[in-house]
């Protein structure tokens, strides 16, 4: 079932001639999620990812590919793109029909969902790691590696039955192996070449501090926000001098709409011990010049500014009063 999409992808992703390799491991993978509500109603979703960046998707209403980046077509021609879209339309129709016919054989009950992921990862030096996995209702079902279908323990007899069935079709297995070990890396390199400028950019992070909800009386939650950085790897830690604070809690690195990233790191401390703490940020775009923000400095600055503004307002009122009073004396 899940292998049918890979057989089609072998046609969709022709080999490229890109020879330059990125120094860091990076992967391209396709995900599929198919929801079967009853014997006549199913819905398919698919997307293609370059690492953590979604570069294309599938519009199930129009039956067309959504290229989310100007460079995500790689070196494909318009004719090849049209062919891809037609093959995907045929695939999804066939996939739904085949699954619905095998519902009883594989002991499936409506509603259910099938997920699949397949792709390849390139390492420096040209090493290739390919992968293909399938799941039902979020549970690992099977995987394919080196001409072997490996049923997952949680897949039970259904997974064993599927592997026994698919391995009878050596032609499909040959296509899948070729796709994962040869075609996928070449397509990946084509996209990397087309998107080199965007993928190799370095954007400096912005950082600021705030106070979160108090975890308990007498405590403060210190929050360090880091946003707008690219690439994704970043190091954020609360410090006291040069001593890392192991109680620092890092959230997930979340995407911004502009393909940069956001992260927050929190630290719960006794209120009277907050003085002297700082947040340190390390990122490749900073050239070794870490961002260091000290807790309390911003608050002191605002207090000083508020006092200065207040004094200025009082002085202004005094000058106006004096001017009016002096003018009144002149009239008399």
UniProtKB/Swiss-Prot annotation:
Ig-like domain span: 185-295
Disulfide bonds: 120-184, 149-163, 224-279
InterPro entries assigned to the protein according to its UniProt record, in alphabetical order: Ig-like_dom, Ig-like_dom_sf, Ig-like_fold, Ig_C1-set, MHC_class-I_related, MHC_I-like_Ag-recog, MHC_I-like_Ag-recog_sf, MHC_I/II-like_Ag-recog
Entry's Gene Ontology BP terms: adaptive immune response; antigen processing and presentation, endogenous lipid antigen via MHC class Ib; antigen processing and presentation, exogenous lipid antigen via MHC class Ib; positive regulation of T cell mediated cytotoxicity
Entry's Gene Ontology cellular component terms: endosome membrane; external side of plasma membrane; extracellular space; lysosomal membrane
Alphabetical UniProt keywords: Adaptive immunity, Cell membrane, Disulfide bond, Endosome, Glycoprotein, Immunity, Immunoglobulin domain, Lysosome, Membrane, Signal, Transmembrane, Transmembrane helix
Membrane-side (Extracellular) residue stretches: 18-301
Membrane topology category: Single-pass type I membrane protein
Membrane side Cytoplasmic: residue ranges: 323-332
Location in the cell: Cell membrane; Endosome membrane; Lysosome membrane
Chief site of localization: membrane
GO MF assignments: endogenous lipid antigen binding; exogenous lipid antigen binding; lipopeptide binding
Motif Internalization signal positions after renumbering to this chain: 328-331
Residues linked to a glycan: 38, 75, 146, 297
Additional information: During protein synthesis and maturation, CD1 family members bind endogenous lipids that are replaced by lipid or glycolipid antigens when the proteins are internalized and pass through endosomes or lysosomes, before trafficking back to the cell surface. Interaction with saposin C is required for the loading of bacterial lipid antigens onto CD1B in the lysosome.
Function recorded in the entry: Antigen-presenting protein that binds self and non-self lipid and glycolipid antigens and presents them to T-cell receptors on natural killer T-cells.
Protein name: T-cell surface glycoprotein CD1b2
Organism: Cavia porcellus (Guinea pig)
Gene designation: CD1B2
């Amino acid at each position: 079932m899940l292998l049918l999409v890979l057989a089609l992808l072998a046609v969709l992703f022709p080999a490229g001639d890109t020879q330059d390799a990125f120094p860091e491991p990076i992967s391209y993978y396709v995900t599929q999620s198919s929801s079967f509500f009853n014997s006549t109603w199913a819905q398919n979703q698919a997307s293609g990812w370059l690492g953590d960046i979604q570069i294309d998707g599938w519009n199930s209403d129009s039956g067309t590919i959504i290229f989310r980046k100007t460079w995500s077509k790689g070196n494909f021609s318009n004719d090849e793109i049209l062919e891809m879209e037609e093959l995907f339309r045929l695939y999804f129709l066939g996939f739904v029909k085949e699954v619905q016919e095998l519902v009883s054989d594989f002991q499936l009950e409506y509603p259910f969902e099938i997920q699949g992921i397949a792709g390849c990862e390139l390492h420096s030096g040209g090493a290739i790691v390919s992968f293909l996995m399938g799941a039902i209702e979020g549970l690992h079902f099977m995987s394919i590696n080196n001409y072997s279908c490996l049923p997952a323990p949680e897949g039970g007899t259904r997974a064993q039955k599927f592997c026994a069935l698919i391995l009878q079709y050596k032609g499909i297995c040959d296509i899948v192996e070729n796709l994962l070990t040869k075609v996928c890396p070449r397509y990946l390199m084509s996209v990397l070449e087309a998107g080199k400028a965007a993928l190799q950019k370095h954007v400096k992070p912005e950082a600021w501090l705030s106070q979160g909800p108090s975890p308990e009386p007498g405590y403060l939650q210190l929050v360090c926000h880091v946003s707008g950085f690219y690439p994704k790897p970043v190091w954020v830690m609360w410090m006291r001098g040069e001593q890392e604070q192991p109680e620092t809690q890092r959230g997930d690195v979340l995407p911004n709409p502009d393909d940069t990233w956001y992260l927050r790191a929190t630290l719960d401390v006794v209120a009277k011990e907050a003085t002297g703490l700082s947040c340190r940020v390390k990122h490749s775009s900073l050239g070794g010049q870490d961002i260091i923000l000290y807790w309390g400095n911003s608050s002191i600055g605002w207090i000083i500014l508020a006092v200065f503004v207040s004094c200025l307002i009082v002085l202004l009122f005094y000058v106006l009063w004096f001017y009016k009073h002096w003018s009144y004396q002149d009239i008399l």
